[in-house]
């Protein structure tokens, strides 16, 4: 099957799908509505590169998404930019799609001269560690233990 990664701002028809995935994985626990989550994925003007969301397509079917944002952790405003909202549709999991999306965002950031990228996770530390990300600190956020990780993109 043919796979490609497209910019969400070029495929506005995918916003409801991407927002639903992100809402189910990350935002519903915080009391945010699906409509509020959709607003997070409303594309920004084309003259800026942050934030950006990309969608992994298999033929014409969206199967995953990932974003790069300026800030993703309110208690660490000094850290930027962030890999965020990496989600693969449940039916497509276990096939390396998260890895594909993470590598794409890393390459995108590298092309923008980003030296270090950040993320936080409560459930995928092992995946990111396998991809070369390092744990920087452990915190509690919204009642969950999270790990803040980073990856140096340039030597």
Regions found by a protein language model. Give the residues of each.
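Conserved beta-strand in the GNAT
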Residues: 53-55, 61-71, 82, 87
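Conserved acetyl-CoA pyrophosphate-binding loop and the N-cap/start of the following alpha-helix
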Residues: 92-104
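C-terminal "cap" of GNAT-fold acetyltransferases
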Residues: 115, 119-124, 137-155
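Conserved acetyl-CoA-binding loop of GNAT-fold acetyltransferases
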Residues: 129-139
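Active-site rim helix/loop that mediates acceptor-substrate recognition in acyltransferases
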Residues: 26-57, 63
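Conserved N-terminal entry element of GNAT/NAT acetyltransferase domains
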Residues: 1-17, 155
């Amino acid at each position: 099957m043919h796979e490609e990664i497209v910019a969400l701002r070029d495929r506005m028809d995918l916003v409801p799908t991407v927002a639903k995935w992100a809402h189910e994985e990350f935002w519903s626990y915080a009391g945010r509505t699906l409509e509020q989550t959709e607003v997070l994925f409303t594309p920004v003007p084309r003259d800026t590169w942050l934030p950006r969301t990309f969608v992994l397509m298999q033929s014409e079917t969206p199967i995953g998404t990932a974003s790069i944002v300026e800030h993703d952790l309110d208690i660490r405003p000094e850290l930027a930019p962030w890999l965020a909202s990496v989600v693969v549709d449940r039916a497509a999991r276990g096939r390396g799609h998260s890895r594909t999306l993470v590598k794409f965002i890393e390459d995108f950031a590298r092309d923008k001269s980003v030296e270090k990228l950040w993320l936080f996770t409560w459930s995928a530390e092992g995946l990111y560690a396998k991809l070369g990300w390092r744990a920087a600190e452990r915190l509690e956020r919204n009642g969950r233990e999270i790990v803040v990780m980073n990856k140096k993109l340039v030597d």
